[in-house]
Amino acid sequence: MINESSAHINTRTTLPSALLAWEIFLTDQGSSPHTITAFLGDLHLLASYLPPDRQVGEISLADLNNFLRWMENERNVPCSPKTLARRITSLKSFFRWLHEGGAIQANPAEKVVQKSVRSPLPEVLTPDEVTRIIDTAREYRQGPDPDLRSFLLFTLILETGIKKGECLSLSPNHINLDASNGPLVFIRYASPQNRYKERKLPLSEEWIEAYHEYRVQYQLDDRLFPWSARMLEYVLEDLGKDAGITKRVSFSMCRWTSAVQDWRSGIDQNKIRQKLGISEVQFREISRKLHTLSRDQSGEDLTEESTPES
């Protein structure tokens, strides 16, 4: 299969020149800046290891294995198992592209052994625990001394799967109550490098109702949650304790629980990735974990074979 970005490349093309074309291909395919930077960084390291005039058709399986051995043991720069596994993924992706595009006759990376990483599974809330926490948060909301903060914080993370840093950065201006497809929260980033993480996520009717009450209770200025990160962690922990949950409820646990709920609901995997605001490379590991967590929440198997996130 020949693609436009590799059509002018042949066995005599040097590795640096081929990488320029690969960057164009990745960009045209809609890969995130994070993915492109990671993949190109790994292949530029290979280019610095090989002779500068080495042609792509001359690169062999032995060259790649020697490169990986050098990176692990001789470079004198730490290379964790997760980093090594990601770099092998980069090699396989690049040489597969060359081979499928007709630039090389054989794929030297095809038989490179992928290194697996035993990565601990995150702890998530069961559906019953989620129900108990939401019921407790509703009691806070409807009690004689109403507390809207706990309900708003927990349900926001559960509905949207946003990260702690994203939650702390939210302002009331990021809540759009009049969007054409229904109320939403706009996750924004100041840095252009992180613009690919920006996304608009829908909000439930119950959350919007609580939000109106919350704005009456708290005089909000430029932050939706005007407290420190640690204080909000305590809010989630205390909510879990009051609901009788033995696990330590955290931002990360709520984010993973949100993703597992979406996975179990059969939502398209790419939509889950976009909702979480992560790259294709990161989602390779995360999707495996979501599959395992969705299949079994018994807590008996706490590790899995997976490709690392970058």
Enumerate the predicted regions with their spans:
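Conserved tyrosine-mediated DNA breakage-rejoining catalytic core shared by Y-recombinases
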Residues: 169-207
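DNA breakage-rejoining catalytic core of tyrosine-based enzymes
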Residues: 118-135, 194-205
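Short basic/aromatic active-site micro-motif
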Residues: 148-149, 246-266, 276-282
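Basic, Lys/Arg- and aromatic-enriched nucleic-acid-binding interface segment
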Residues: 132-160, 164
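Alpha-helix N-cap/helix-start motif at helix boundaries, enriched for small hydrophobics
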Residues: 91, 153-154, 161, 165-170, ...
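N-terminal core-binding DNA-recognition domain of tyrosine recombinases/integrases
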Residues: 2-5, 20-121, 140
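Active-site/catalytic core of tyrosine-dependent DNA strand-transfer enzymes
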Residues: 202-246, 258
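Catalytic-site neighborhood detector that most strongly recognizes the C-terminal catalytic loop/helix
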Residues: 124, 276-310
